[in-house]
Amino acid sequence: MHYYVLFTFLTLDLAPVALSLSTCSALDMDQFMRKRIEAIRGQILSKLKLNSPPEDYPEPGEVSQDVISIYNSTRDLLQEKANERATSCERERSEDEYYAKEVYKIDMLPYYTSENVIPPSYTTPYFRIVRFDVSSMEKNASNLVKAEFRVFRLMNTKARVSEQRIELYQILKSKDLASPTQRYIDSKVVKTRAEGEWLSFDVTEAVNEWLHHKDRNLGFKISLHCPCCTFIPSNNYIIPNKSEELETRFAGIDDAYMYAGGDSKSKTGRKKHTGRTPHLLLMLLPSYRLESQQSSRRKKRALDAAYCFRNVQDNCCLRPLYIDFKKDLGWKWIHEPKGYNANFCAGACPYLWSSDTQHSRVLSLYNTINPEASASPCCVSQDLDSLTILYYIGNKPKIEQLSNMIVKSCKCS
């Protein structure tokens, strides 16, 4: 029984050490940087589910301004969120995941407010707009842990195509005619004629922005992935193409269209799907729990750029590493950015967990379970940021957000 408990403890507590690229073993800095570069090469291809780099792609000058505009807005959003986390000393993710959250459901704002009003005719075959009132949650904005948008897909037996890729966008407040009016969030491939199902999208960043900036709450847009249609950013219009209509139907949005033949057009469809209205699920950390955490938390020195880059450190610290896609990886297929600050963690962890302070039976058992791993602490990444890239598969532009690509701080573990 004792061995079972020890094995469970060691497996859970030390698994990140074995999986991390760290400085447990002696490595000179040049060798470690080369290993880091090769790890990034494999990481990017793996995240994009590519076996090898794409061979066919357009020249940089051939990329349209609309594609560049969407890339820039997505990249800027990530940077804004990273800056907000840095200035507000965001709670550690591990604490957010440990404590129980309160869940709130917010239904979509209705298209019509009266039961006696016939809903407007079906006039937007290319996209749907969904809006929410989250003002009641504004006082708890800093407690938001996660927000999820859920919409129920209806079975559409009259659909001309059996499968479509739908995309979710956050509608932006336009500053001028040249600025983007939507920001890509996520996409899903759905079966239009299949039995109905719930679709879920992570919209934490968008809802967090709404809670802090009420005037930016313009809702979400559900549209079709449609490269053959022309999108006009200045007025949010799509040039019609009959072969690319959105034929995916949603409960609470398309009820009137789906059941237009029923009696009382304004009521029948809506009542049929009671409980399946598009909604947000907000998960918040209770205020009393957040206050308790903040009052008892000790301030720790962050091994980040602000500390490590201005101090010469032999011990565990963040080390700068800029990856030039063309020079370091020999890649020309990533159009934006040209490179990025990947960084890495390196250095000794001499005081946290020395081998002579551990019980010999624990060390012996751990070495038996994982003989190639180190029983000493390793310098590993703690906080990581995402990277947004623009690349092409053939002539098709793709904008992807790659998680955990930029090391921001380190720790001994």
UniProtKB/Swiss-Prot annotation:
Signal peptide boundaries: 1-19
Key word Disulfide bond present in the record? yes
Q: Name one GO biological process term.
A: tissue development
Coiled-coil parts of chain:
none
Q: Which InterPro entries match?
A: Cystine-knot_cytokine, TGF-b_C, TGF-b_propeptide, TGF-beta, TGF-beta-rel, TGFb2, TGFb_CS
Which Pfam families has this protein been placed in?
TGF_beta, TGFb_propeptide
Q: Which UniProt keywords apply?
A: Cleavage on pair of basic residues, Disulfide bond, Extracellular matrix, Glycoprotein, Growth factor, Mitogen, Secreted, Signal
Recorded GO CC terms: extracellular space
Q: List the disulfide bonds.
A: C308-C317, C316-C379, C345-C410, C349-C412
| Protein name listed in UniProt | Transforming growth factor beta-2 proprotein
Per the UniProt record, the source organism is Xenopus laevis (African clawed frog)
